[in-house]
Amino acid sequence: MSRSSNANRYGTLAERKLCESRGLEREGKHTSWCDAEFRNGTPVEIKAGMVSTGYWQVYEKYHAELRRHDGWYGFVVYRPHGRGIKVLKEKMVHSSNLPPLSWSNTNHKERQSRKALIRFEEVF
């Protein structure tokens, strides 16, 4: 399995685990800027990062959309464990309470947006 396939699979597992632990609705809620919702309909973007990377990526246009909807981020740090993952830390943060973001250009054709990196220690 390729590295990006593993990252995608691990990210999906992290989303599921956060939804279970926080009581979030995931099914049928996924968009480019929202992975789940609180039961009251408030959107949540889930950011999962493998402990070895040390950061998450946030895209400016998706962050702006989440802010417009008064949404939240669910941050997850995990490590691979067998065929799954072990969640090491998780935290919910309102989209207005992120650490200062420094936007940089990206050549990602599909995203067409600037990105910022958020180090794990800035959230935990």
Please place each PLM-identified region on the residue numbering.
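Nucleic-acid endonuclease domains
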Residues: 1-124
